[in-house]
Swiss-Prot record:
UniProt feature, compositional bias: Basic residues: 134-144
Family annotation (NCBIfam families): tatB (TIGR01410)
Subunit structure: The Tat system comprises two distinct complexes: a TatABC complex, containing multiple copies of TatA, TatB and TatC subunits, and a separate TatA complex, containing only TatA subunits. Substrates initially bind to the TatABC complex, which probably triggers association of the separate TatA complex to form the active translocon.
Compositional bias ranges of the Low complexity kind: 145-163
Organism: Caulobacter sp. (strain K31)
Region listing for Disordered, in residue ranges: 130-190
Name of the protein described by the UniProt record: Sec-independent protein translocase protein TatB
GO annotation, biological process: protein transport by the Tat complex
Main location: membrane
Length: 190
């Protein structure tokens, strides 16, 4: 609405208008003020429309002049000027000759891998060290100990199986009893 006037400023203006004009005549004044602002906006829109129409007519006049000049053959288009410059064969030939010379000189490589020259690195000579393997120890007598260990393993699961059979019955909590709900119908009559 009004970008420079804030909300508090509008309240101050409304309070002053209420005091000066009075509560009886304030609605009539605001209605007339709204009609006046509407008329001003209408005039501004009409002026803008007429200005735009004149601009369109001037552009159309320029286009009409260009069309008439083309019909008469007096129109020099920018394309004709560009064609005249491109018609200079010596300049075009010179550009192509420069391009061919740079390609043939070897300064430009077709493949980027050919253009890259990696610096040559000297590889250090490999050093050979002879390492002796440690001697193996003879295997200890584990064969006699293994059957005894297996016997213990076999006996242990049997003992644990007996213990687990007795543990199968896990004590459980007794089922929880639910309290009876109070009836919604009242037995009391008044």
């Amino acid at each position: 609405m009004l970008p420079d006037i804030g909300g508090t400023e509008l309240l101050v203006i409304a309070a002053v208008a209420l005091i000066v004009v009075g509560p009886k005549d304030l609605p009539v004044l605001l209605r007339k003020l709204g009609q006046f602002i509407g008329k001003i906006r209408g005039m501004a829109n009409e002026f803008r429309a007429s200005f735009d129409e004149m601009a369109r007519q001037s552009e159309l006049d320029e286009l009409r002049k260009e069309v008439q000049a083309m019909r008469d053959g007096q129109y020099t288009a920018p394309m004709r000027d560009a064609a005249a410059q491109a018609g200079d064969a010596s300049h075009v030939d010179q550009v192509f000759a420069d391009i061919d010379a740079s390609l043939n000189s070897g300064a430009v490589k077709v493949s980027p891998f050919e253009a890259y020259q990696a610096p040559a690195l000297e590889a250090p000579e490999p050093t050979v060290e002879i390492v002796s393997k440690p001697a193996r120890k003879p295997p200890a007598k584990k064969a006699a100990a293994k059957p005894a260990a297996k016997a213990e393993l076999v006996s242990k699961p049997k003992a644990s199986a007996k213990a687990s059979k007795g543990d199968l019955s896990v004590p459980t909590k007794p089922a929880r009893k639910r309290a009876a709900k109070a009836s919604t119908n009242s037995d009391i009559t008044s």
